[in-house]
C-alpha cells in the first residue's frame, strides 16, 4: 500500500482518497482534500499558509533537517522477496519511528524552553518596575502579633491582681 503526500499541505493520502490533477506537461499534483485543491487553484504559496507543513518547517516550528527523514525516500527498485529481509525492514522502520518521535519531542521542548526563559526575564522586569504594588503578606503582622501579646499579658496581670 503506497501512501502519497499531498502537494499542498504534505499530509498523507491513502489509496482511494483525495484527488489528482495532471497538468499538460504530465506533472502530477495530488491533494488530500478540496481545501488543498482550492488553495492550489488560487495559486497560494504553501509556505505562506499557516496550517501547512511547509509553513511550519519554514518558520522553524518543526524539525527540518534530520537523518531519520532519509528513510522516507521513495525507492522504485524492485527487490526479490526474502522473509528475513522483510522482517528486518519492519523492525528497522519501527526503530526509526521511535527515534524520530524522540527527536521531534526534544526539538519542541528546546523551542519552548527559549520562550520560557524569555517570559521569565519579562516577568522579573515587570516585578521590578511595579514593586510598589506588591505588599508583603506579613508586613504588618509583626506589630499586630506584638500588640496582641502585650494585651494578653496585661489581661493576665489584671486577672491575677483582681482576687
UniProtKB/Swiss-Prot annotation:
Keywords: Nucleus, Ribosome biogenesis. It comes from Pongo abelii (Sumatran orangutan). This is Probable ribosome biogenesis protein RLP24. It holds the Pfam family Ribosomal_L24e. Involved in the biogenesis of the 60S ribosomal subunit. Ensures the docking of GTPBP4/NOG1 to pre-60S particles. CDD domains: Ribosomal_L24e_L24 (cd00472). SMART domains: TRASH. GO terms for cellular component: nucleolus; nucleoplasm. One of its GO terms (biological process) is ribosomal large subunit biogenesis. One of its GO terms (molecular function) is structural constituent of ribosome. It is found in: Nucleus, Nucleolus. Associated with nucleolar and cytoplasmic pre-60S particles. At the end of biogenesis it dissociates from cytoplasmic pre-60S particles and is likely to be exchanged for its ribosomal homolog, RPL24. Belongs to the eukaryotic ribosomal protein eL24 family.
Amino acid at each position: 500500500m503506497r501512501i502519497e503526500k499531498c502537494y499542498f499541505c504534505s499530509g498523507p493520502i491513502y489509496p482511494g482518497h483525495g484527488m489528482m490533477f495532471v497538468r499538460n506537461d504530465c506533472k502530477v499534483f495530488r491533494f488530500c482534500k478540496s481545501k488543498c485543491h482550492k488553495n492550489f487553484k488560487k495559486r497560494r504559496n504553501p509556505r505562506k499558509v499557516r496550517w501547512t507543513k511547509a509553513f511550519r518547517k519554514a518558520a522553524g516550528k518543526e524539525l527540518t533537517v534530520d537523518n531519520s527523514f532519509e528513510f522516507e525516500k521513495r525507492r522504485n527498485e524492485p527487490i526479490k522477496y526474502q522473509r528475513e529481509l522483510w522482517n528486518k525492514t519492519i523492525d528497522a522502520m519501527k526503530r526509526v519511528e521511535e527515534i524520530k518521535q524522540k527527536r521531534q519531542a526534544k526539538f519542541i521542548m528546546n523551542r519552548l524552553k527559549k520562550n520560557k526563559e524569555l517570559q521569565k526575564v519579562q516577568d522579573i522586569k515587570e516585578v521590578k518596575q511595579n514593586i510598589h504594588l506588591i505588599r508583603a503578606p506579613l508586613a504588618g503582622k509583626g506589630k499586630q502579633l506584638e500588640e496582641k501579646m502585650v494585651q494578653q499579658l496585661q489581661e493576665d496581670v489584671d486577672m491575677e491582681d483582681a482576687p
